[in-house]
Amino acid sequence: MSGETEIDDPEVSDGASENDYSDHEQELDVVGKEDDNQEMAEQKVRPDGDENGNTVGAAATATKPKFDPKDPLRPRRKKARRACFACQRAHLTCGDERPCQRCIKRGLADACQDGVRKKAKYLHDAPPEALRPVLGPTYNQQVSNNRATAASTPTEPSTGMGNFFTQPDTSPSYPLFAANQQGQMPPPLQNRLSFGSNQPSPISPTFHTVGNRPAGMQGISLPQVSNDSHAAFGGGAFFDPSNPALFNFDLEGLNFGNHYGALEFGMLGHMASGSAETPPQDSSAGMPQNVGDLGYNNNPAFNNNPPFNQIYSHDALPDFAVAPPGAHRPAKRQDTKSGPSGKLGPSSALGKRNRDPSSIYDTVHEPYSYTTGFHSLTAFIQKRFSPNKTLRIAKSLASIRPSFISCTKTLNRQDLVFMEKCFQRTLFEYEDFMLNCCTPTLVCRRTGEIAAVNKEFTLLTGWRKEVLLGNEPNLNINTGNSGASSSGSSGRGSFTTPRMRPINLVDSNTASLNSTKILQD
């Protein structure tokens, strides 16, 4: 097409544009536009000349060649992501800006809008508002009559706070501040305001610090939040998926042709980055109504609102964190040599166990006797199962046991101790995984002994953790007699194995509901 064979020449381009569009032409005629395109192509390959038609300068000796449309080395023009309605009907090359340059020269700037595309088959179930084009940096939403009003906005900062998100007319507006409320924020809150930091937040994308605010917002520090905007934090209108500023990523940089794919990819990255935080259960606690009732004089700030003063007491806390400074959740388990300290670190605030794995290398001094474990397993199988099942188990064990024997044949005592330390160190990491996993899980050695178990497995089977790990005697393996398995027990052999009573269908449903409630707690 001729639109693709245009040459980036400012003189020829201006002449072609003036010849292409006239002021008196109002109808969009496809045939007429094709004639104009042919005339434009002829004019671009025509050499420069004076008024008499004589060639002048370097163009007299060399003429511009006409490029072959199939030539891969021909200069190409950057295509727009979506043409406007006028350029789409005329089959002309459009631009990303709105209004485009062709509509501006024709006087159709007010009517310049994106053309309608045919939906793909996989997008038939997508809503129409999710298929809007990605708004580029050159997108101009305001028409010419509103530009004069925006120029006078810096003198009155409060009048420019109505609609903060620059979205098309179809999207809802997001009023975040009351138009008639102004005030000067005290210095302590300016320095410790969490949703004014440089870190992106999925809940407060439009808050800025004093240094990086627009020109129309320099006079406003923290106005009182209106009731409508306060309800938007907990309502569904604020979390509009068509609003790109909600997720704090650049949709233009993702190079997607519509919001449907860009938002999905951006939200996946948003979740992967860990910036998605748990919203507060009570929206009124996250954003109090009496923000504007702060002390703006020489009196100390937050005299009448102690809970609000505690919100911004820590810079490291996430947005809308309302816990007091000493209300960190304690660690679930602390196995460090030194006792629990009075000041908890960031890891304890997140509920992670503050253990020291170096204790493994100090406590493990003997290798684990897998030979004794295999003999105990064989004796238990012969006593518990029938001869046919025992033979099948023995064949299965015989296929894997020679591999372990050949691996440990050349190892000395230090190697076996090192192997046990590696096992305990790996088990140290597995226990953290099992603590955060809701699936009933247990870790066994290759000889069958249980090395670790999580809480969900004990709830499922009815066995306590001490019995499963062999710390307390039972009637299965650790009977309380002398041996390696009962070395850590109390020595009493009167403990009985717990028996699960048979239950009917109603009791099973009740038990499943109770176990689900326990897991949720």
From Swiss-Prot:
Family annotation (CDD domains): GAL4
Residue stretches spanning the membrane: none
One of the record's GO cellular component terms: nucleus
Name assigned to this protein: Transcription activator of gluconeogenesis SS1G_02293
Family in the record: Belongs to the ERT1/acuK family.
Main location: nucleus
Compartment(s): Nucleus
Regions recorded as binding DNA: 84-112
Ranges of residues in domain PAS: 426-497
Domain of life, source organism: Eukaryota
Organism: Sclerotinia sclerotiorum (strain ATCC 18683 / 1980 / Ss-1) (White mold)
